[in-house]
Amino acid sequence: LIAKYNLTEKDLIAQQKNAISKTKYHIKTKTIYTIIYFLLIYLYLFITHTPGDSIWFGITVSIIFSPLLSIIYRHGMINRFRKDVLRHHQHLTGDFSLVLSDDELVKESKNSTERFNWSEFNQIKEDNDRYYLYITDLKAVTIKKEPENMNEKETKEFQALINRKKNSG
């Protein structure tokens, strides 16, 4: 099967959002930031010799605001991705051709060709419009679910192949 599609900045940001919420790396990093946040609150309360009631108030406030850390982390990572990766690596967007077989996946653009065996992907995730084939927690191949060059029957065959690989791995 040969699929042709265009990846935009929106597609890569969607992949980054998926990675932030589903990969071990980002989950561990968010956990570490949360622990550091609590330690800093407790350290501040200890250094300022805050009375007991204020310590409980500080703990309560830190627990209430801890969900904001996840939102701040996600927003920060997306902004960093926009500034660093998308600005300096414009070859990640544009027109791509994808050759799929039972053994491998070949991703081609005007600048490069990448070959992957299906066994190289440790996770295959998806959203409504895309598949994310993770090689590592930080490197993924983003594929549109509906290629531009395929009719409905070919698209279903294309999706069935990826879903078979997703369910077998």
Q: What is each model feature region?
A:
Residues L1-A3, E114-F116, V141:
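Short beta-strand segments
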Residues L1-I47:
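N-terminal membrane-targeting/pre-transmembrane regions
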Residues K30, T34, S54, G58-S62:
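Residue-level signature of transmembrane alpha-helical entry/exit and packing/kink sites
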Residues L45-F57:
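Membrane-interfacial hairpin junctions
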Residues G58-R80:
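Transmembrane alpha-helices and immediately adjacent membrane-cytoplasm interface residues
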Residues I72-R115:
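Conserved beta-hairpin
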Residues L105, E114-Y131:
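Phosphoinositide-dependent membrane-docking surfaces
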Residues R130-G169:
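A membrane-cytosol interface segment of integral membrane proteins
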